Amino acid sequence: MNKPAKPAADDVDDLFGRPLTPAEEDTWFEHNREAIGQLVDEAWAEFERGEYDERSFAEIIAQGVAEHNAKR
């Protein structure tokens, strides 16, 4: 017997839930302000140490697409 197919998500809300209200966004950012700041500080430190990828965004995306297609 065939296994039934998974229902496909037909809406972004099906995948991620409803969008946050402006008040909920403000609360989320306030709650995560310190962690976001730490991530930004670390990103700048990595950039200053020369730890970044010199490829363009398009090149990085193309590599990801090629790797994804190779798995098929």
From Swiss-Prot:
Inactivation phenotype: Cannot be disrupted, suggesting it is a functional antitoxin. No visible phenotype when the parDE3 operon is deleted.
Assigned keywords, A-Z: Toxin-antitoxin system
Entry function: Antitoxin component of a type II toxin-antitoxin (TA) system. Neutralizes the effect of cognate toxin ParE3, but no other RelE or ParE toxin.
Name this protein carries in UniProt: Antitoxin ParD3
Source organism per UniProt: Caulobacter vibrioides (strain ATCC 19089 / CIP 103742 / CB 15) (Caulobacter crescentus)
